[in-house]
Amino acid sequence: MAGRQSGWSQAALLQFLLGMCLMVMPPIQARSLRFVTLLYRHGDRSPVKAYPKDPYQEEKWPQGFGQLTKEGMLQHWELGQALRQRYHGFLNASYHRQEVYVRSTDFDRTLMSAEANLAGLFPPTEVQHFNPNISWQPIPVHTVPITEDRLLKFPLGPCPRYEQLQNETRQTPEYQNMSIQNAQFLDMVANETGLMNLTLETIWNVYDTLFCEQTHGLLLPPWASPQTVQALSQLKDFSFLFLFGIHDQVQKARLQGGVLLAQILKNLTLMATTSQFPKLLVYSAHDTTLVALQMALNVYNGKQAPYASCHIFELYQEDNGNFSVEMYFRNDSKKAPWPLTLPGCPHRCPLQDFLRLTEPVIPKDWQKECQLASDTADTEVIVALAVCGSILFLLIVLLLTVLFRMQAQPPGYHHVADREDHA
């Protein structure tokens, strides 16, 4: 009986000690989402331009060329709804201005896409309704003039070094072979469209126009057969590779997509060291923006980013306090976002590894790296000459000042004290 009581007392003591340990031990922090960056393409739009023989000119489109359509508005509203569901519990259910910052390129279609997206992401709560009959609230979208945009409008320029890389790309076997293989096809398309000097780099305009017209139920001309449109689509994808790859992809990335990636990484690093807002940073831009970024990350799938597609960066704080980055690409509204893996890192990539692996494509000084080698040398010589000239000028001025003062002194001048000493 005494042994049983002793056993019970030992068990009670162990339970008591365990409870005390749990009370004094710091709680284990669960893995948590800390920050999200989104880059999405605008929604469905009208063609950017028509070709000379196009039966559908600008007056065919309600708002003219390059404008967001009702379909595009709906695509982004639905994306906003999907994001609202994905980040339920992370973002406030109602719009809170300190949680969200949105920047767009200065195009009607990207600005309107961002607004439609925000309408789906943050429908007004009862207290936010300014009119009971309108289920919408204004949310700010920021932008800069196109001529000043050095973040989202690609390709970035002017950049002589990038243009030099493009000229080198035109001399590669891949580009040359593609030109030879498609020479007759390009001539045929040029003849049917009335376009002059059609190249691998400009053919995408023809595909884009036909794609927009076909998407909106317009009858294509007889020459634009399914086989022709498919061939145009393949050349259009090649034009994206030409812009950001094929030749010296890392150097191109430093001058193009790496600029945007640098800003994204700067924001991720900042959010890992502070609890400041915002929680969500959104960029509304173009297919070229997405391709430039994904080529810099080396995760591009070789296909044009569809309307309202969205590249997602999620910053997590792990239960051990460290930070990790996960990437996703939503390019199909009927499927969950596709996980993207940075080469050399698992999908849940530690932030420090993410920064290290992307360092080769991050420019140190974009303006300087954009200069040609001869321009850089000339600039250094000019600066050196300017410095030497300035120093020489100052020495001459100083010398002239001394000489002037010496000549200004009267020749018979003596101190009074001297006169008294020799009286």
Curated annotation (Swiss-Prot):
Alphabetized Pfam families for the sequence: His_Phos_2
Single Gene Ontology BP annotation: response to cGMP
EC class of the enzyme, as a word: hydrolase
GO cellular component: lysosomal lumen; lysosomal membrane; lysosome; synapse
Transmembrane residue ranges: 381-401
UniProt source species: Rattus norvegicus (Rat)
GO molecular function term, any single one: phosphotyrosine residue binding
Subcellular location: Lysosome membrane; Lysosome lumen
Protein name listed in UniProt: Lysosomal acid phosphatase
PTM remark: The membrane-bound form is converted to the soluble form by sequential proteolytic processing. First, the C-terminal cytoplasmic tail is removed. Cleavage by a lysosomal protease releases the soluble form in the lysosome lumen.
SS bonds (residue pairs): C159-C370, C212-C310, C345-C349
SUPFAM superfamilies, A to Z: Phosphoglycerate mutase-like (SSF53254)
InterPro entries from the UniProt entry: Acid_Pase_AS (IPR033379), His_Pase_clade-2 (IPR000560), His_PPase_superfam (IPR029033), Histidine_acid_phosphatase (IPR050645)
Positions in the Lumenal compartment: 31-380
Keyword field: Disulfide bond, Glycoprotein, Hydrolase, Lysosome, Membrane, Signal, Transmembrane, Transmembrane helix
Gene transcribed to yield this protein: Acp2
Catalysed reaction, written as an equation: a phosphate monoester + H2O = an alcohol + phosphate
Positions on the Cytoplasmic side per record topology: 402-423
